[in-house]
Amino acid sequence: MFVTFPDSPFRLFQPFPPAGDQPTAIARLIEGIDDGLSYQTLLGVTGSGKTYTMANVIARAGRPALIMAPNKTLAAQLYAEMREFFPENAVEYFVSYYDYYQPEAYVPARDLFIEKDSSINEHIEQMRLSATKSLLERRDTVIVCTVSAIYGIGDPSDYHSMILLLRQNDKMTQREVIARLTQMQYDRNDVDFKRGVFRVRGDVIDIFPAEHAETAIRVELFDDVVETLHLFDPLTGQILQKVSRFTVFPSSHYVTPRETTLRAIEAIKVELRERLDWYYANNKLVEAQRLEQRTRFDLEMMVELGFCKGIENYSRHLSGRKAGEPPPTLIDYLAKDALMFIDESHVTVTQVGGMYKGDRSRKENLVDYGFRLPSALDNRPLKFEEFEALMPQTVFVSATPAKYEAEHAGQVVEQLVRPTGLIDPIVEVRPVTTQVDDLMSEVKKRVAVGERVLVTTLTKRMAEDLTDYLAEHGVKVRYLHSDIDTVERVEIIRDLRLGEFDVLVGINLLREGLDIPEVSLVAILDADKEGFLRSERSLIQTIGRAARHLNGTAILYADRITDSMQRAIGETERRRAKQIAFNTEHGITPRGVVKRIKDIIDGVYDADASRQELKAAQTAAEYKVMDEKSLTKRVKKIEKEMQDAAKNLEFEKAAVLRDQLKELKALLFGVEERE
């Protein structure tokens, strides 16, 4: 059932009306927004429907919204849910488009310069462009993003000034259209028609807009007038509909008008002269020669093509900012009255605070040793105080708000009652001495009735040992750790839900934003070791992973009860008591969460393709930093593996190894091998 609200462009799909604490939470948050509160906190327990509450607040407020999540996995989950709540509105996804990213760096101790190397996910790049397009074009927009939103992208005013507006009966020559598309960084290719490409056949120009995944536009000119505009399917060529106007957006966020580029080139030349004078005065001749050679090459590319590799390092000059000013980011594209929701704020807020310094220390080496001009330091993420200054009205969303939210919340809205009547898990404390044997017997009980178990340990070593031990005793177990990429992590969670295995072992499971209704037991080993992984907030988050199951239980293995444990157990008991009282008062019988098992990043990643691209990019980067001796060893090893594969008739494997070998030999000998 769809519902609409006065003066709101959103149509909210409401499968059921708000229940439990949701109606009160929605009303109080809307009241806070109307009263002009800058910050509010939604303290919502696991399984209380925080995402549904957010969707209701967005629909009732009727303003564009930005939802920031701590990682790609959670962002994908939120994006999928928001698309279900707002199927007729613009729900967009803005995360880092790198499947793999090796930033430019210099290691002075080894005199080693590492070139920037990356593997860009085309589909996510298209979604990022679609996100900024929606923000510029419409009010009914919800953007789900990660901390990637605080990194510099092109200036909104430059980006907007480069838009090509096509209207029926407008006067426009074929040459003018082609020139404009070239300025917008579209490539002409009459053979391979893909995103960011146009093709020309006489007076017919086909354009595949960079922000569209499945629609292209055909422009038919007659006597230097736009005669007709048709949307068509780029794969089949089938005409979809005739339109009277169409807006083509630039193919990159870094696109810049020609006059701005020429102005920037002059400013870069001035900075280069000043920097070279400084190097000569300090007798740093190698650095001076290196900087001049690299910068002049970039300037030549910018004069000829309008852009160069690593153009983002000149973003300060291109946007006309002063030294030290913040770069334009996604937040600059937001409307002035937009709303911001920071999901899992206890993690996300600290992430935002940590980005600037890590980026700065890497770039300082590049500047000191003549690889980049000092202005490259201004191609950076926002500092925390700059982010604060740009924040629109904000709602922090967390089950365990941190100190920052407590200090900044105009009001704290609690959502402790679950509409399903589910009660917080029973928390038990058991001795450490017998923790592994006790865990084994608990696991067997749960597996026998088709339930799943999460186990969290303190160290990687212990997680690996425990996984091996459980596997030896016939338990179907997997191990989740930081080396597993986003796509594989999502698949492991999906496999656990499907019953491919029964026990998932990890170190910091709470970070993964796990939403697994099938989990009935969470076991926390060494719960009495005070520290980040066993703080009150971490314990509450981890205990909450069992809160979506009727028989949810959390076992804390400890020889003493620490202050953090005491507070976490006390808070869980308080929430249990409130839910039980609500259930009794309203005659509710708790029922488990039934959630369709689907790939939560459907439409965001092609899992197999992403994994293959990522692996190839990582291997290539690994080869580039190897010395000659290591490369020779690797060549011999791969040659042997290739011959063995061919002997065993594994020809596909042999072909992959052959390609790796060609790449290695090209690196080793500096030439491509001929067939």
From Swiss-Prot:
Q: Where is this motif: Beta-hairpin?
A: 97-120
Domain of life the protein comes from: Bacteria
Annotated Helicase ATP-binding domain ranges read 31-419
The UniProt record lists the UVR domain at 632-667
Where does the record say this protein resides? Cytoplasm
For this protein, the record's SMART domains field holds: DEXDc, HELICc
Please name the SUPFAM superfamilies in this protein's record: C-terminal UvrC-binding domain of UvrB, P-loop containing nucleoside triphosphate hydrolases
Record function comment: The UvrABC repair system catalyzes the recognition and processing of DNA lesions. A damage recognition complex composed of 2 UvrA and 2 UvrB subunits scans DNA for abnormalities. Upon binding of the UvrA(2)B(2) complex to a putative damaged site, the DNA wraps around one UvrB monomer. DNA wrap is dependent on ATP binding by UvrB and probably causes local melting of the DNA helix, facilitating insertion of UvrB beta-hairpin between the DNA strands. Then UvrB probes one DNA strand for the presence of a lesion.
In its UniProt entry, what is this protein called? UvrABC system protein B
Species assigned in the record: Thiobacillus denitrificans (strain ATCC 25259 / T1)
